[in-house]
Structure formats: C-alpha cells, structure tokens
Amino acid sequence: MSKTLYQKLYDAHVVYSAPEETPLLYIDRHLVHEVTSPQAFDGLRAMGRKVRQPGKTFATMDHNVSTQTKDINASGEMARIQMQELIKNCEEFGVLLYDLNHPYQGIVHVIGPEQGMTLPGMTIVCGDSHTATHGAFGSLAFGIGTSEVEHVLATQTLKQGRAKTMKIEVTGDAAEGITAKDIVLAVIGKTGSAGGTGHVVEFCGKAIQALSMEGRMTLCNMAIEMGAKAGLVAPDDTTFDYLKGRQFAPTGSNWEQAVAYWRTLKSDDDAKFDTVVTLRAEDIAPQVTWGTNPGQVIAVNQTIPAPESFSDPGERASAEKALAYMDLKPGIKLTEVPIDKVFIGSCTNSRIEDLRAAAAIAKGRKVASGVQAIVVPGSGPVKAQAEAEGLDKIFIDAGFEWRLPGCSMCLAMNNDRLNPGERCASTSNRNFEGRQGRGGRTHLVSPAMAAAAAIAGHFADIRDIH
C-alpha cells in the first residue's frame, strides 16, 4: 500500500498499538530548554525515576537568556531560577547541557540541526511549539507539553494518534530575493492560520527542492502557524551534504548505510493526501503581516484589506480587531507605515544565510533615525561564522546592535521586548497580541525585508533597493 512520508515515519516508530488505544511511539531525540523542563525533572525526582536514555536527550538555555551579557542574573529572578534548575537537573540526570558559557549554546532549534542531533527518519520532540523546524530533514518533529516532557524523559516513548496529511506543493521558480519566509507566509495567507489543524504538512515542489536546508528549516518552523502538528520536507542530497561531518551525524560505513535508508524517506508517487494545496512560486512577492496572526499577510506592494472584504464573519471580526490593535487603516500600503524597532533573529531566521541576506541590505547604509535594530545570531557557531565573514562589522557600522545568541525579542521572556504601542519589523514566527511585549505591534518579514525597514524607517520593497 502506498504511503506518505509522514505515514512511513509514524509506522516505523510504533512500539505498541492495541484496539481502542492511542499508539505508543518511540522517540529518537528529546531536546530540552529551561522553561518547560523544571516541573518534568521534579516529577522524575518525586517518583524516583531516572532519564531512560540520557544519551538521546540534549539541553540548552535559550528562552530567558540575556543577549547582552553572559550573566545568569541579567534577565531577572524567574529566568535565573529556571536556568539554575536546568544546570542542576542536567548534572543530576546525566543530560548534556549547552549552558550560557558553552561555545555551541544557542536556540534549541538552531543547535539541533547544527550539531547533527537532528537526522532524517527520526522522531524528535521538545517542549516548544516550533519543534516542527526539524522536519526540514525528513524527521517527524513536534512540540509537546511539560507532562509529556516528563513521560519522554522517563520512558523514551510518547502516545500519539495519527494525524491527517496535507501536501503543499510550490511549483516553479521563485523570483530573486524571494525567500523561504516569503513562501511560507504566502502559504499561510492562503490556508489561513488554522488551515492545517489536525494535519502533518509535507512541503514539496520545484521551489521547495531549490531551498537550502536553512530555507527548509524556516518553512517547517512555521508549519505550526497554519495550525499543523508538524511540517516535513523529504531528505535529498541537499540534506545529506548539510549533515555530513556534523558532530552527531554517522560516520564511515554507518554514514553510507544511513544515507541509503534516508533516500527511501519520501512519499510514494501514488500516495493519497487528505488535503492538497498548490501555489506558484513566481506569484509570490515579499510578504509582510498586517494583523495579529501570521495568516493576516499581504505582499509588500498590496494595500491593507478592509474587514468587509472578508466573507467569513469570523475572519471579518478578526480583521477588525487586528486593525484596531495594530493601529492600521485599510486601503493603505505598509510601505507608508513607520516602525520603531527591528528584530533579526529567532528559530525562524537567525542562521548564517539569514544574517548574510540582512547584511547585504545593510552594507554601506545606516539605520534610520529613531529606529532601534538588533541582530541576534541563533547560536555560538552562527555568531562566530558571521564574525569571521565580517558581518558583525557591517551591521555595527550601519547602526545595528550585534548581540549574543538567544531567543531574544521573539517572545517577551527576557529583556528584549517592545514597549506598548511600538511597532516592530521582525523575522520571528508569531505576531500575536503582546507576543513581543505588552501592547507591542509585530509585523513578520524576511531578514532582508527587516534590514530594509531598519534603513528606511518604514517597510520597504527590497526589489526597489539596489
């Protein structure tokens, strides 16, 4: 019987199934950070349990960390307690920790692939909704809650029902300057922020195959923003070239065996999907969100829609509420809207290619007066590589702030946040009310678009910048 990639991955990991019961899946990798793990480790301690497979569990500090200093006290008492608890728990339970002073420390969804912890065919979980990022490698990766974190620590398994399947095919070639961020925002604009609910999404088509691994990670990172459980891209030579030689990747004959297996990880030609969505890459322009969910998005050269243009009453009400919160008027272009802050970073867009794209716009230019622009590399190795290439100097000369790795302004859990009423061009993944700080207004864009906004002082079409 023909199977989708998701069905192959799911079936390969079922360790127990019975009628009227949710199947039990084996978990190959468990990634842990300071925010969703303390209660899980406390639960193990209370029951006298150990971590069943500490060698398959990896931890880092990212959500709470300061991006201006390595001082554990810098982000406040709650952050300090959570980070100190993680240090204690990893020491006690034998889990490898990339702490504040580790050269490889960074955002959990950046360091996993970077170190080769993420490999095709795996099941990967983390107490974080953007775990879908790792699906770029053809692995089944999804976020879990704290009680599930405890269950995986204790058993290396998790009960998980079958999801529906969705194929998103992006045909043709994207225009120059159109990135994975623009593609995925255009997809979410078409499906809506709940269009993928109950599904695992597989991205395919010529435009997807043309993406680098970093682009594919951006794509899968935001699968959750259309309501999907996970996102997938079938592994290919681009995947294998990226992984070869990384710290936790197989070596020697094990590598050859692994690649031979990984090549089988693709949907069969006649596999049936529950839902199919198709977009033409050549129709996709640089995207900017205007509302308070990622589905409220337009091309940079389009006008903000009027609520009455939505036929669905729920969408109409949502648009009215979003426009009021964002303090925007329908019928205007976002290129007329001034900004206060720019954030280049997050598990969506903080890798070396993202920083290169932003630096190419920033080079020889200056951040507009009154705009604060920060660049936050996703990990220690990304920061080191960017500095070796001189990108930090380009940003600093242009008036951007060059920071230490961390989740930073993606979410208001550290010192990097918006003040009430401030408007931000952000390369992160969520533009919900208050996401970047109470009363803050978030517009999601690609790294190049964020850099262009910093220079112009308002949103700008990168296609007009030479």
UniProtKB/Swiss-Prot annotation:
Family stated for the protein in its record: Belongs to the aconitase/IPM isomerase family. LeuC type 1 subfamily.
Protein name: 3-isopropylmalate dehydratase large subunit
Cysteines joined through disulfide linkages: none
Source organism of this protein record: Serratia proteamaculans (strain 568)
SUPFAM superfamilies the record matches: Aconitase iron-sulfur domain (SSF53732)
Record keywords: 4Fe-4S, Amino-acid biosynthesis, Branched-chain amino acid biosynthesis, Iron, Iron-sulfur, Leucine biosynthesis, Lyase, Metal-binding
The keyword 4Fe-4S is assigned to this record: yes
Pfam family, one: Aconitase
Molecular function GO terms recorded: 3-isopropylmalate dehydratase activity; 4 iron, 4 sulfur cluster binding; metal ion binding
